[in-house]
Amino acid sequence: MSVINCEEVKRDEFHTEKYYESYNIFGAHIVTEDEMRGVRFTVWAPHAKAMSVVGDFNEWDYEQHKMLQVTEEGIWSLFIPHIEEREIYKYAIETMAGDVIFKADPYAVYAEVRPNTASVVFDIKGYEWNDKNWSRKKKKKSVYKEAMTVYELHFGSWKKKEDGTLYSYREMAEELIPYVVEHQFTHIEIMPLVEHPYDRSWGYQGTGYYAATSRFGTPHDLMHFVDECHKYGIGVILDWVPGHFCKDAHGLYLFDGTPTYEYKDKDVQENPVWGTVNFDLGKREVRNFLISNALFWMRYFHIDGFRVDAVANMLYWNKEGQEQSNEHAVSFLRELNEAVFAEDEDFLMTAEDSTAWPLVTAPTYEGGLGFNYKWNMGWMNDVLKYMECAPEYRKYIHDKMTFSLLYAYSENFILPLSHDEVVHGKKSLLNKMPGDYWDKFAQLRLLYGYFFTHPGKKLLFMGGEFGQFDEWKDLEDLDWNLHDFEMHRYMHDYFKELIALYKRSKPLWQLDHSREGFQWIDANNNEQSIFSFIRQGDKQEDALVVVCNFTKATYENYKVGVPDFEYYNEVLNSDAEQYGGSGQVNKKRLKTFQEPYHNQTAHVEITIPPFGVSILRPVKTRKGSKKQDGSKTKVRSNVTSRGKR
């Protein structure tokens, strides 16, 4: 990609039109002009009175390197010869009020390690990628009809060195990737890696949207990390925050002394929940900044997806106490998704949205926002409330476990067990479970069994796979020493077996977004808090029967209606002794009885374990078996879901 000389750019391309390569104009680019090597600095500051570039090269004297205003709308530029890579710099901006403020470059691709705040000249080009095979394989797969297991993590607290320092991008490639491969996750989702000044913001309050945070190394080091992920078949999703940004003095806030990237109207500018300000998504220059940024990460870092943070905060703003939709945000999100999918039709665009806004994952040409996935926050909240309830009272909130199936096909959903639910006093997943030590582990195994068999793709926050006992502590690493304890090892073994079963079982993911893929057997047994259902794949014989018991009672010879296959085998039981359970399993092949039950044509009798999930797979179809209407037996279903992009 060539650097565009900003003096040759028509002002309409950035100020009034869709221009998604703004990173080629703005920022600090190493170039040769008039046979001299140096750096071209370009910045947008529409209300600046004067601009200059400062750094060690001029002893931070803002009188030396004055910038030239090249458009009336406020593009400033300057070529400085003999400046080399790794030079640190800022922009000195004289405001209309006569003050001089110092700002980091909004388009810088590298920055000093915090607490320092200067931008760093860096040649982003030149990394040699080795992921062509990954790209070819990705194009052969459907993001809708494949297994998807996402491992969400915070880069700085997954694991630390013995002295407490952080692993670099390259070191994390050596530490993290084998772990992810062992657990058969298909993707990792990393909490924001844009440059940010405050560790405890977890990256959600950024100052440098184009700069991969220098806490862990250089941009090329991060490229190496992504390249290695692709080498081992792992997709990389980044958390991305296009709705709001932090108010640190060196960042985007009041960039030229006036609201530049944020709204002017204080009622909609301020975001009091997080102490941030909202991007002015109605301003063309801001849209070009953000959409160019998304494409920059795709093109330069080969990212496979974004989890777009706080979409609810973007869709609605609270002005004078009235909740109103933000039409700027609605049109921005549609424009963003159109640009992203024009670049890569196999990209993952996931909305973190807790609202009931319709058609979030419908294409824009159908009136949707254009995402292809949405976090199912309702499912997460309902299920965790149910699990936190004492088992004997769960029968009174039975609908929390069934309600999600009323809307499961209204969007393309990912089921998140995310970082938000294991922090700020909410307890870890394991510690949310009521009861004694054994009960907690049994119920977490049960939760995971329900999680992996419920329609929707899967996301789990780090530590959940082995039963992290304490809630997430962002300044520490995970409690890896828990592997010294037997029950945590059992939990870890169970999780790995469960995710392996999920990946090799087409019924659990092939029809995630179609009503054909799920059927209740019994959704109404609130007295015993038992749920049973069928997951179905494309083929009739691709079916699994799932029975979940959310109390500590054990049931012998429990009748479960099933599709009419001759035999069933239990392929997983969360109560097996090798997982730390009591051993109430169904070891023998289960013969079906030709008596209708639960609105099915046959039934089996099984042992249902305490706080357990039992997954049954048919062995073979009964030869010549017929339903009462004379048709061949198949799993009953309703209408298919609407078409996808």
Swiss-Prot record:
Group of enzyme by EC: transferase
Pathway field: Glycan biosynthesis; glycogen biosynthesis
GO biological process: glycogen biosynthetic process
GO MF annotations in UniProt: 1,4-alpha-glucan branching enzyme activity; cation binding; hydrolase activity, hydrolyzing O-glycosyl compounds
Keyword entries, A-Z: Carbohydrate metabolism, Glycogen biosynthesis, Glycogen metabolism, Glycosyltransferase, Transferase
Biased composition (Polar residues): 636-645
One cellular component term from this protein's GO annotations in UniProt: cytosol
UniProt-annotated catalytic positions: 309 (nucleophile), 352 (proton donor)
Family matches, as InterPro entries: A-amylase/branching_C, Branching_enzy, GlgB, GlgB_N_E_set_prok, Glyco_hydro_13_cat_dom, Glyco_hydro_13_N, Glyco_hydro_b, Glycoside_hydrolase_SF
Reaction(s) catalysed by this chain's protein: Transfers a segment of a (1->4)-alpha-D-glucan chain to a primary hydroxy group in a similar glucan chain
Source organism superkingdom: Bacteria
Region listing for Disordered, in residue ranges: 619-645
EC identifiers of the protein: 2.4.1.18
Transmembrane segments: none
Entry similarity comment: Belongs to the glycosyl hydrolase 13 family. GlgB subfamily.
Record's subunit section: Monomer.
General function of this protein: Catalyzes the formation of the alpha-1,6-glucosidic linkages in glycogen by scission of a 1,4-alpha-linked oligosaccharide from growing alpha-1,4-glucan chains and the subsequent attachment of the oligosaccharide to the alpha-1,6 position.
HAMAP family (UniProt xref): GlgB (MF_00685)
UniProt name for this protein: 1,4-alpha-glucan branching enzyme GlgB
